């Protein structure tokens, strides 16, 4: 299932901000059922987008290490 084009174009920060707004509205319990379902679906798409962006960022992060002969070098960072 692909995400809507407007979500695909969002930065991590934009998607997270909208996701936080949706969560707050859902937690308030004030939205009608159909609106809540639509917000939940959009929230799920935003969450997936944020996870994808975070994974891409994680793969780009490198750590600086001392290579052979004391020269600085970089290698992929390991998380977990």
From Swiss-Prot:
> GO CC terms for this protein?
cytosol; exodeoxyribonuclease VII complex
Q: Which UniProt keywords apply?
A: Cytoplasm, Exonuclease, Hydrolase, Nuclease
EC number(s) on record? Answer: 3.1.11.6
Q: Where in the cell is it found?
A: Cytoplasm
Please report which protein family the annotation says this sequence is part of. Answer: Belongs to the XseB family.
Q: Which NCBIfam families match?
A: PRK00977.1-3, xseB
The entry's protein name is: Exodeoxyribonuclease 7 small subunit
Native organism: Phenylobacterium zucineum (strain HLK1)
